[in-house]
Amino acid sequence: MPEPSVAHFYDELADDYHLIYADWDASIRRQGDALDALIGQERAAVLDCSCGIGTQAIGLALRGHRVTGSDLSPRAAARAALEAARRGLRLRTAVADMRRLPFADGQFDTVVCADNSLPHLLTERDVHAALAEMRRVLRPAGLLLVSTRPYDDLMRDRPASTLPQVHQVADVEGGERTVTFQLWHWHDGEHYDLEHFQLLPANGHWRVRVRRTTYWALGRDRLTSLAAGAGFVDLGWRMPQETGFFQPLLVARAGM
């Protein structure tokens, strides 16, 4: 999918992204704790190169890391900085394509690319370009953490939708329910168009918001191979039941 439509998808979602969580602050803490355990050092210089509204970046900042966030969506990156400030944290953010990161070589101890962000890139060439940039901005032996959906499992069934998530959210209409679900339209063997639906209460009625984007169902072996080709070593996958993170994580080190 062309770059503007991915940025547009997240610009449109930025104000309401937190509504996909039953308790966004609890998710921030939980995801930050899980990633912090994998980082395994104090006050690491961390780049979250797909920071969105800050779920992982803020969680890591709460753990004492020196976090920089970048995202293709200007509205998401701006909200991440604002949400960090509201929590008394400093989060420097930039609007950037992960294939062209505006940071110096070797600037970071850890690069995070979480929440199925990398599979917005739909070709091996683009994924390799992004991974090569992540490698470039990492110090030698720096840590890479990439999370995706469990595509090896999903490719077997090619689901047409996700189950609706119904949450009671305190900041919506005095605590009324919100509903979020997705429709998936598989248009070839491994790519799918996604429609993201949110139903929000509005004066006794439902306001429906729909955003659309495209993903590549990038399996673990293929992503591992692409990361190795971009200069990463010691590659392995850590599963949610082991890490406490909500998606499978590719864990790797920048080659010397």
Give a label for each model feature.
Residues 1-44, 55:
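Conserved class I S-adenosyl-L-methionine
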Residues 54-100:
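Class I SAM-dependent methyltransferase SAM/SAH-binding core
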Residues 99-110:
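A short acidic, Gly/Pro-enriched loop at the edge of an enzyme's catalytic core
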Residues 110-125:
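A short SAM/SAH-binding and catalytic strip from SAM-dependent methyltransferases
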Residues 128-140:
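A short glycine-rich, Lys/Arg-flanked "PGG" loop and its adjoining helix->strand segment in the class I
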Residues 141-148:
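Conserved beta-strand signature within the Rossmann-like core of class I S-adenosyl-L-methionine
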Residues 148-220:
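SAM-dependent methyltransferase
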Residues 214-256:
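C-terminal lobe and adjacent flexible extensions of AdoMet/dcAdoMet transferase-like proteins
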